[in-house]
Amino acid sequence: MGAKIKLTSWLDLKTLGAMSEAKNINNVNAVYMLSKSAEVYQDKAYVMNMRESGTPLTVGSIGLDAHVNGWFVNLNANYYDRIYLSYSPSYRYEKVLTNRQAAHKAFPEIFAPTTLDGMSWTEDAVAQEKGHGGWMVDLSIGKSVRLKKGSLNFNLMITNLLNNQTIVTGGYEQNSRSSYTVDANGNVKNPRLYQFSKNPKKYYTWGTNGMFQVSYRF
């Protein structure tokens, strides 16, 4: 949804906003193969409500466009939120969730529970990782000079004017299997304090950057 409002003969206000869900509506039955043994397994993956990654599902923008005597200025403030990371299906396999619960019982000071009643998984156990959103301000200033033949145009564009480098642009969850081992009897051993599942890989916005452009029209 967007709108453009003419404030004066030389100044316009622009707004834009969108919200999306883009999520799975059910769990799935998965078939996968372990590369180290080439064995094929079947399991249930609890991926319901997992959302599309790599793009903000909530966006908003407000901007001012000014045009006076050959000058133009565009100032835009853009808001991004609900940025989900690419989820790991294997982290949500029923067998893995069961092993994670066993790891919690064996080492409750390290691993969180995946079920409280033995009937359903906790929200945190299957929650999708998210990235930090926020505001980004962009500025463009230009001047057009008419010549006898054609015109000369100057344009300075600055992206991320406020140097906000906390906005996540994407990333992915990391597998949790290296946090512990499970022997043939189902006993959890060799726990590790560092959990990859709690430390997803994230990518962040570039800092302030810009470009100066000169063009000639004829």
Regions found by a protein language model. Give the residues of each.
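Transmembrane beta-barrel outer-membrane domains
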Residues: R51-L57, K130-G134, Y203-G207
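Flexible, solvent-exposed coil segments and beta strand-coil junctions
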Residues: L34-A45, A112-E123, K189-Q195
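Gram-negative outer-membrane beta-barrel transporters
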Residues: M1-P89
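Structural signature of outer-membrane beta-barrel channels/translocons
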Residues: K4-K6, W10, D65-N69, G142-R146, ...
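Extracellular loop and loop/strand-boundary signature of outer-membrane beta-barrel proteins
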Residues: A45-M50, D124-Q128, S197-K202
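Hydrophobic, lipid-facing positions within transmembrane beta-strands of outer-membrane proteins
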Residues: M1, T58-I62, W135-I141, T208-V214
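C-terminal beta-signal and adjacent terminal beta-strands/loops
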Residues: N78-P108, P113-D117, H132, K143-F218
